[in-house]
Structures are given as C-alpha cells and as structure tokens.
UniProtKB/Swiss-Prot annotation:
InterPro entries listed in its UniProt record: NA-bd_OB-fold, RNase_II/R, RNase_II/R_CS, RNR_Ribonuclease, SH3_CYT4, WH_CYT4
PROSITE patterns on file: RIBONUCLEASE_II
Subunit-structure text: Homodimer.
Region (Disordered): 705-730
UniProt GO BP: mRNA catabolic process; mRNA processing
Protein source organism: Neurospora crassa (strain ATCC 24698 / 74-OR23-1A / CBS 708.71 / DSM 1257 / FGSC 987)
Compartments, record wording: Mitochondrion
Name of the protein in its database record: Mitochondrial protein cyt-4
Protein purpose: Required for RNA 5'- and 3'-end processing and splicing. May act on the RNA processing enzymes directly, or it may act on other regulatory molecules, which influence the activity or synthesis of these enzymes.
Family statement drawn from the similarity comment of this UniProt entry: Belongs to the RNR ribonuclease family.
Domain RNB per the UniProt entry, residue ranges: 561-916
Annotated GO CC locations: mitochondrion; P-body
Lineage: Eukaryota, Fungi, Dikarya, Ascomycota, Pezizomycotina
Keywords: Mitochondrion, mRNA processing
One Gene Ontology MF term: 3'-5'-RNA exonuclease activity
Length: 1117
C-alpha cells in the first residue's frame, strides 16, 4: 500500500518507517515475518498419515483470541466481523494450545513509550495498539433479517463469503407421524466423494464442493475456494454422484477436520475461525473441481447466445422440466455422450447460468437419483415474464421525476387509475374487517353489500404480478423484482401502520381487494405446480377435459376375473369417506391354522388407459389432497369414482396372502376378481366388535388441548356417504371373520416390529375446517366478497394405528404387489431406503437404543436424532430397483391399495395388468409364467431391460419411469404432502391462534398467557425452538431478546417461560418474548467434551457415527 508525501509523489509506508528510524532502505527487499512455532508444538496429529497443519492458520487463530481477551482490534481481518465466542473447555477439546495469559507480543516489547528503531510498520502499529487499547467495536452488517428482501445489487457478496444456512424448517424430518414414505427433503442424500454445489439462497452464491461424509448426523464439505463447511440441513440443487472415486483422495482433508462433533454451534464457530483443512490438504480436490469448473465455463462461453436468452428457446407455457430437458433446447447435440446424455460439466453450465441470472423464473424443485439431468425446474410462462416487465415499467413511470406535473401524469401514468380502484376496494373492506399485521384480516364485524367495482386490464396485470410476489413466492429474497410490489403498496397510501412493506402486506392487500379469501392459505399458491390452477374460492379449477364426461374403455381384464361371491368383504373406513378403494375377506384352507387373506382393491386401470385424459390429469394431481376446506380429488369425476368404489358386483384387483397364526407369509398371488357381499364398518366399531387385540402396540395418551374458533357445523352436515354397519348388526360369522383377521393382522404387526418397524405413532396436531357458516359471493369482475368466518378446530390426533386390520393388512397387500412384480422383473415405483441395507446393523442399534424408546415413552426424538436416522436410512425415495424399508419392517414395498387416490398406485396396477394379460396368454399356450427369479433382500436385482419390457407389452419401461415419470412424481408427491400435512395444516392452526389471541374469538382462556419454550438451536439472528402448545415452532428475535439475555448466552436445551409477541400466518411464523429461564441447557464446552469422550461407545451414539462412510472415518479422535 502507498501513501502520498509532500516530498515525493508516493512513498511506501514500510520504507518511510525505516527511513525515519535511520535504517538503510534496500530496493525490492522485504523483511520476512517470523512466526514462533513453539506455541503450536502440542497440536495433535489425527492420523499418522496426515502431515501437521501449517502454523500460519492457527497462529492467526491464537491472535484472534488474544485480541478478544484484551478487547483490542489488532487484525484487519476483524473489520466488520463479530468474533464468535467459544469456551475454554471447548478450545481444550479442539487441542488449541491457548494459554490464559498469552501476551507474547507485549512481553517482547519495552514497557516504556520509547519506540525501538528496528520495528517494521506492522510491528510499530501492533505496538501502538498495545499501548493505546480500545474496545473492539464491530461494524454493523447490512445483512437482511430472515424472511426480509436482500439488497443483492449494491451490496455484493463473493463466493469467498459464502455461508450455509442451517435452519431446518422441515417439520416432517423432525417428527415421526406416519408411514407414507414421502420424503419432504428437496436434496437427496449425499455420500463421500459426491460433487455438490453449496449455495446461499439469500445471496444467490454457489460454490462447488466435495462431500467428505456424514459424521454424527452432520455433513462435511470441502469447497473449491479451499474452505471447509459443515451443515446439518444441507440443500443443493446440483449433485454429481461419485465425482471422487478413490477414498485416498479424501483422506488428507478428512484427517485435517478440526472436529466431527454433532453440535452444529461448535462447528459454526470453527468455520468462522477458518479452522479446518488448508489448501495444501485439499490441493488434489481443488484441482479436480477447477478442471470441472473450467470445462463448464468453456461450454458456457461457446454457447453464450442461447444460454443468455433461455426463454426464447424454451416452450412458452409454464411447465416442469428436468435439467436434461432444458439442455436439449439450449446445448448442441454434439456435446452429448453416447449413452448418458449431456456430461455433468455441460449440465452445470446450463444450471449455473439459469440459477445465477434467471432464478426469478426457473425454480429448482429437487434432484432425483439419475444424476444432474434429473434436477427438475418449475419454468415460468413467457407471458408471466412479460407481465412483470410491463408492471415494472408502469411503476417506474409512476415514480419518474419527469412526470411530476399533473398533465403528464394523467397522460402517461397508467398506474394511478389502478391505485384509485384499489383504494376504493380497500376502504370498502375495512368497513367490514380490520386490517392486521398478522398476515390475515380480522373477522367480520359487519356485513355490507358486495362491491361492484370494475377492474381494468392494467389493474388485473398489476394484481397478477403482486400475486406472483406475495402468494406464489416467485421472486427470491435477492430478486431485483422485490421492489415492485413494495412500491405499489407505498403508492396506495393505505399501509402506513405496517413496519415493512413486504410480501405479507402484499398478501393482505390481495385479501382486502377481494382477490383472495380472508382465510386463504398461502401454501395453496406457493406450492402450486404447473398444470394445476388454484380456484381462489377454494380447491382447484377443473381442466377443460374434466368438464367433459369421462370416457371409459371396456374392461380388459374381464376374461381373467374370478368371483369372490362366497366371501364377505369388509370395507373398513371412516363414515364420510367417498372413495372406497380397499376391503378384506377371509378364506380358510385345508390346513388348520392357515388362512388366505384377500385384500380387494378397486380396479380403475382396467378401463382407464395410461395415455387417456383421465390418466394425464391424475398424473398432474398425483394424489387426492385432504387439506381441510380444500379437498381435491385425484379423479374428480364423481361418476368415475362411483363406478369403481367397492360395492357388490364391482371389479377388483385382489392381492392374496397365505398366512399362519405367527404372521408368516407362506404364499401369495394377484387375481382380477369381482366381489360379492360388502360390509361397511369403521375401525372403531371393529374394535368394539372383536374386543382388544394384542398387536404389541404401546399405549400412548393423547393431549386434550383444543383450540376452537367460529361456529361448529351441525351433525346433519356430516352425514355418512353410505350405509354403515354397527357392531350389533354384525352376524356371528362376521364377528368370527373379524376376530381371525384381527388376530392375523396383529401377528403380522409383531413380525414387522421384530424387523425394525416403528412401534407407535405419536399424536400430532390436526385441524378441522368448515365453511358452513361462511359465505363466498362472486362479483361480476371475478373477485370475491366473503362474509362471516369459517369454523376451525385444532386438536391432537393419531394418523396411524387405528386398528391392525387397516394398517397391517393393507401393508401386506402392498408388499405382495411389490414381491409379485419383482419376481417377474417388472419395473414399478418401489419405495426405497437407499442406505438401509448397508446400515442395517447400525439402524437396528440406533432405533432400538435411541429412537424407539423415546416414542414408546411418548416423546418425539430431537432434530439431531431424526437427522441421524435419516442419514442411516438414506431418506425415502422411489426407484425401479427395490430396497427393503427398515422403518416399516418389510423386505420390499410399493403402494397399490389406493388407485382412486394415488397416481403411483395406478402405475403399479397398469404394469400388473399388462403382466397378467401376457402371463394368461402364455399359460393358455402351455408356456411358463413370467417368474424369472426368487426374492433375496440382500441381493436385489434391477428390473428387465427396456426391450424385454416392450415385448411383454408393459406400458412403462424402467428407463422411462426413471427419466420421465419419477422426477415429476417425486416433486408432486412432496408438494402434496407438504401442503396437506405440514404447511397448509400449520396455516390453519395459526389462523385459529390469531383469531383467538388477537381478536378474542372462541372460549376465554383457551390460549394461555404464557408458554413453556424449549430452545432447539441458536441462529445468527434469532433463537428457534418449540412452545408447549400443539408443539409449534417459534422464535425469539433480537428485539424481543434485548434486555433479557445476550444471543451468545442462549443454549440449545434452554427452557424458558415466554409470551406471544407476534404471529404471522402468511409466513407461518410465531415470535415469542422471553419472560424467565426455567432451566438452562448443557454448556457447550461440557457437551462437546462429553461427545468427544463418548465417540466409539455404543451408549453415547459413537457406533452410529458415519456408518455409511466407515472407511473414511477419521482415526484417533
């Protein structure tokens, strides 16, 4: 660095310092810095094969802590940075040789103010700071708070400033409530050697990194920038499997990890201190990543024209597209490899381009198991992009200084008429409902006639863009389009009471003008996928095909059907169920103690073809959505559902199991059939009729907490959909059948428990919703006038375990469907746990010692424990090659028992149907069946090849399923589950909470004044945890924490008494204010020491550390 001087233009500071001290100045020479190595002599080597770390890094670390203790700022690297606090105990465990009075620099200097004549400028500055101590004051960061827009234009961040978010918002990962085997995690499990892109969603920064493995449930990565990262909630949009194939290339970096503890807060502090492997340790990995990155950049530069304007070359309509499909439009075919399509470097060129420059209109939704080409995007319609540009121009013209005079504004300002229309609608709404900052309007206070305002086309365009911003969540936090909606709200002049004009205010604006219902659910819009249109009055809009009567083909299985008229079929379901797609019957054999159990499933695929409009609509829906108040059927045609719901004389596809009294599966078969007599009965009435059955299911109490607002519907409004049989109406034979079925189902359940099945599902909050007393009126302009308010009731319920007949016999049918297809090599959507086989012993130990005892005791395992379990399982997925499902205690599994409600079940039925027809033809000709192999869960083989599948007439080949069907199916199943079971349910709960807490609805005192709050983790800007009220997530932000405690003093495991400070329904967020500590969590240093001492011991979880990468586990820790 140079500085100006009065005697010469520029003078080096170091030369000037030496000149003033009388030193001889030599050109082009520097005095080398000498670092003392004695203070690092005690640093342990983690493995004999790993060289010592360079001293420079840890010398800097020691200097940071010395400066912290003295309250000094002696390092330019501290500017704008808050030094993380870390306890002495933890430092000792890190083996950092930090002595209490480390002041070697001051001790080496004279104790007088006289300065030595032999100091460099750096030494002189250090001495000056030592003689003039001042407390360190961090420069405030301009980082935005969570959920707030980010200034990503004038405040840029480089890839070297990347920080990985570790907030785990996936409630389904943290709790065990069901066995639907749908993984809500967007990112598949990564393993050591995989290449990933680490990303910051806030700043749109992406950095390539190699996964080092998972240790104590936390993933570790080494980035191309030479930095080490650890993450407990890793998310990536781009993964290349087996990028590093030789484990020896990873070992130097793994051996240099400073810690592999399971406490994320400690690892975060170490990352901030730049601890971890150096560039020398990771030189080999960096070289390989740079080669990959440079190849990708060369491909990008060679195809710059098409990549710079991707939407110009893609289809105009909104759709889901895989990265491989997008690359087909944007890259030349000559880049393709013969059998695998585009290479990963070419795919990364496309991915990195659209993620960096077009992330507003390309939203990655997850990656499958078929490599980067299976990454799937929600691609916006070209008309949406044009509307955003049009509204942006309108808003800019409205605020442009050259249009300030009235005449010009009247002629050119197209936004002002829209604002006048909106103000009238807002003022009319506020005469009936109070506006609130809680992401929803208040309840109805008076009823007025609906407004008849006429909305212009410009107004509809502006409203559409605000809908994209506030309802559909199209724009990321760092998007340049975030300002548009805020500018429109500011111009309205009606939201002065809002702290920030953000998307939440935009959401309430849409409610006030009648575009959305006051009780609308945000997740219905943010989770909507292409092909489905949300009906703003509730549910989904029907497609044009659905508005026409459905056409059904002839029954292709009619010649194969067998009659089951001699057996009574028991359809066990709720009285208000409309799709009756399963039932069971019993058949005795000629051997005592052995029975045939027949599970009869509705058979719509016999008359619905895979390429029909009904099938295509079912593929878009994926499954029936049971979101309260917005039930949307996969097959919406009532006539079709009635045609195939089980009833006397109806067709069925029957999955039969021969069982003994011990629950052992002796034989199985699949038969097209017709059912005879049917008894409809509820699970509760079955339990009443047969009495208690010992299925080994532990008893658990259900909390009696209830939150209720609105007027409940009358009993007449919930009439059953069919004649239900009561226990006293059952015949003697019916009771005997149900007793045997219950006994066999209980035996099956015990077998599954022995194989590792989850023993019990704990109660979870559920919401009931009724619009009986609310009124929705459509205005002539297509808007909504809503009066009164819906009824919402929140209470605890159990999603599984109602009766063994329901759960275990349906599970057996699914197992038979999977087994039957596997024996014939038929590709179907098998449900899989990718790592369960290789981690079986560790899974058994971990579940039996850690997870299941807590469930049996009525306690949900912690986030860290459930994350470790998921790492061992490898998550849930669908694939054409099966694995066994450990947590269900089954060796092979698919879903086949709800074809009227799930598209994956239709896929299974179509494949089985084609195989049955082919097998029937072969047997008629005297040939053998299609069975080609026996089942062995430890040596599972892939399905038949595509040519053989085509010869058999299968509608779907394995490659078609893996590359075309499964990527879409994964995303749509995940969104459907998230909407109905997580985000949508939580919004209904928060709506009821706001109406009771903020507006005083419902019974007095049903919302406590104070709650017990347990801290789960401490983030950079808040504390996150759960309150003891429906187990809801809540956070303590810095404003509410001020005056109570420093953020650095909060610990995971702290128990506090808190009060509600804010509830935001739109953001699904609760903020609480701490009142007092009830109990302190374990100190970080002591917790870390216990974990380090416990590694390798079964009782402390050491046996479960990095089981999936055992060969790569650091030694000697």
């Amino acid at each position: 660095m140079m500085r100006p001087s009065s005697r010469q233009p520029y003078v080096c500071w170091q030369c000037l310092s030496r000149k003033d001290s009388g030193q001889h100045i030599a050109l082009n020479t520097r005095k080398a810095r000498v670092a003392s190595l004695s203070s690092l002599a005690s640093w342990p080597i983690s493995s004999a094969s790993i060289a010592p770390r360079p001293t420079r890094q840890w010398d800097r670390t020691l200097r940071l802590f010395r400066e912290r203790r003295q309250g000094l700022s002696t390092s330019t690297s501290l500017l704008g940075r808050k030094i993380p606090e870390i306890s002495n105990e933890a430092l000792e465990d890190f083996a950092l040789p930090l002595e209490p009075d480390l002041q070697h620099l001051q001790d080496s200097q004279p104790k007088t103010t006289k300065r030595s004549a032999h100091l460099s400028i750096r030494q002189r500055l250090k001495q000056w700071e030592a003689e003039n101590p001042e407390p360190f004051h961090s420069i405030p960061s301009d980082f935005a708070l969570p959920d707030r827009p980010i200034n990503a234009f004038t405040s840029k961040r480089s890839e070297h400033m990347l920080e990985i978010e570790n907030i785990d918002n996936d409630n389904a990962t943290a709790q065990v409530h069901d066995q639907d085997l749908i993984d809500t995690q967007v990112t598949p499990r990564v393993q050591a050697g995989d290449l990933v892109e680490l990303k910051s969603e806030d700043w749109n920064i992406g950095v390539l990194a190699v996964c080092l493995g998972s240790f104590n449930g936390i993933d570790h990565f080494y980035a191309v920038t030479g930095k080490w990262f650890a993450s407990s909630n890793f998310k990536s949009g781009f993964i290349v499997k087996n990028f590093i194939t030789n484990s020896a290339d990873l070992q130097p970096v793994i051996g240099a990890l400073p810690s592999t503890v399971g406490d994320m807060s400690i690892l975060v502090e170490l990352q901030k201190l730049r601890a971890g492997p150096t560039r020398e340790h990771g030189a080999g990995l960096i070289t390989k990543m740079l080669d990959f990155q440079n190849t990708s950049r060369q491909i990008y530069q060679s195809n710059l024209e098409r990549l710079s304007n991707p939407h110009r070359h893609l289809p105009e309509e909104e759709q889901l597209m895989t990265l491989g499909e997008i690359a087909e439009f944007l890259l030349p075919p000559k880049l393709k490899q013969s059998s695998t399509g585009f290479p990963p470097a070419a795919l990364y060129a496309v991915y990195n381009n659209i993620r960096t420059f077009f992330d507003d209109f390309f939203h990655p939704l997850g990656q499958g198991t078929a490599g980067p080409s299976s990454i799937i995007f929600h691609v916006a319609a070209r008309s949406d992009i044009e509307n955003v540009a049009r509204v942006e121009r309108m808003v800019r013209d409205h605020y442009s200084p050259e249009l300030l005079d009235r005449k010009s504004r009247r002629e050119h300002d197209r936004l002002e008429p829209v604002l006048r229309q909106a103000r009238l609608a807002i003022d009319h709404s506020r005469k009936m409902r109070e506006w609130s900052s809680h992401g929803m309007l208040g309840p109805t206070t008076r009823v007025l006639p609906a407004s008849t305002y006429s909305w212009s086309q410009d107004a509809l365009t502006v409203i559409g863009v605000i809908h994209m911003w506030a309802a559909s969540d199209v724009f990321p936090r760092s998007s340049k389009y975030q300002w548009i909606g805020a500018a429109v709200l500011r111009a309205l002049g009606r939201y002065q009471d809002a702290d920030v004009l953000d998307a939440t205010v935009g959401w309430t604006f849409l409610q006030e003008i009648g575009w959305l219902m006051p009780w609308e659910i945000h997740a219905r819009h943010s989770l909507r996928l292409p092909g489905l249109q949300v009906n703003r009055a509730g549910g989904l809009l029907p497609s044009p095909e659905e508005q026409q009567p459905a056409e059904l083909d002839e029954d292709v299985l009619a010649p194969l059907r067998q009659d089951f008229y001699t057996s009574t079929v028991y359809c066990i379901d709720a009285p208000n169920a409309k799709e009756i797609d399963d039932g069971v019957s019993l058949e005795k054999t000629d051997k005592e103690g052995e029975y045939w159990i027949h599970v009869h499933i509705a058979d719509p695929t016999s008359r619905i073809r895979p390429d029909s409009s009904l099938a295509k609509r079912a593929a878009l829906m994926t499954q029936t959505s049971y979101l309260p108040g917005h039930v949307d059927k996969m097959i919406s045609d009532e006539a079709v559902v009635a045609e195939f719901s089980l009833a006397p004389g109806r067709p069925s596809l029957t999955f039969s199991a021969r069982l003994n009294e011990e629950g052992t599966l002796l034989d199985h078969k699949v038969t097209p059939g017709r059912i005879g007599d049917v008894v409809y009965i509820t699970p509760q009435d079955v339990a009443t009729a047969v009495g208690p059955v010992d299925a080994g299911i532990p008893k658990v109490s259900t909390p009696d907490v209830v939150l209720e607002v609105g007027t409940p519907p009358s009993a007449e409004d919930e009439a059953p959909t069919r004649k239900m049989t009561k226990p006293d109406e059952l015949s003697e034979q019916n009771v005997k059948d149900l007793e045997i079925l219950s006994r066999l189902a209980a035996a099956i359940h015990k077998v599954r428990i022995q194989k590792g099945s989850v023993p019990i599902f704990l109660p979870s909050p559920s919401a009931d919703f009724s619009l009986v007393n609310a009124r929705i009126e459509h205005t002539p302009s297509g808007f909504l006038a809503c009066t009164n308010d819906p009824y919402i009731s929140v209470k605890y319920s159990v999603s599984g375990g109602l009766h063994p007949i329901v759960d275990d016999l349906m599970g057996t049918a699914n197992q038979i469907a999977a087994l039957w297809c596997y024996e014939r090599g038929i590709p179907i959507p098998f449900r899989t746990n990718l790592l369960a086989a290789q981690n079986e012993e560790a899974l058994r130990a971990y579940t039996q010692d850690v997870i299941y005892p807590q469930l049996i005791a009525g306690k949900q395992p912690s986030l860290e424990e459930m994350r470790t379990l998921r790492n061992l399982l490898g998550g849930h997925d669908i694939a054409a090659t099966p694995t066994f499902i450990y947590t269900m205690g089954v060796d092979i599994y698919t879903k086949a028992t709800s074809p009227l409600r799930r598209y994956s079940d239709l896929l299974v039925h179509w494949q089985i149907q084609a195989a049955l027809l082919e097998e029937h033809k072969r047997l008629a000709q005297g040939s053998q069946s299609l069975v080609i192999r026996k089942f062995d869960k430890y040596h599972l083989k892939p399905p038949m090849d595509d040519k053989q599948a085509a010869r058999l007439g299968l509608p779907f080949t394995a490659s078609h399923l893996e590359n075309k069907v499964f990527p879409h199916l994964r995303v749509r199943e995940r969104h459907a589950k998230t909407l109905a079971n997580i985000d949508g349910r939580n919004e209904l709960i928060l709506q009821a909470l706001v109406r009771a807490w903020r507006f005083g609805e419902g019974k007095e005192g049903q919302v406590p004044e104070k709650f017990t709050y347990t801290v789960v983790n401490v983030q950079n800007t808040c504390v996150r945890g759960r309150i003891d009220y429906f187990d809801l997530w809540a956070e303590i932000d810095l404003d509410n924490l001020a005056g109570f405690s420093l953020l650095s003093n909060m610990r995971a495991g702290d128990v506090l008494t808190v009060q509600l400070a804010d509830v935001n329904v739109h953001m699904r967020k609760i903020v609480v204010k701490p009142v007092e500590f009830v109990q302190r969590g374990p100190e970080r240093g002591r917790l870390f020491a216990e974990e380090q001492e416990g590694e390798g011991e079964v009782e402390n979880g050491g046996e479960y550390i990095d089981v999936e990468h055992e060969v790569l586990q650091p030694q000697g820790r």
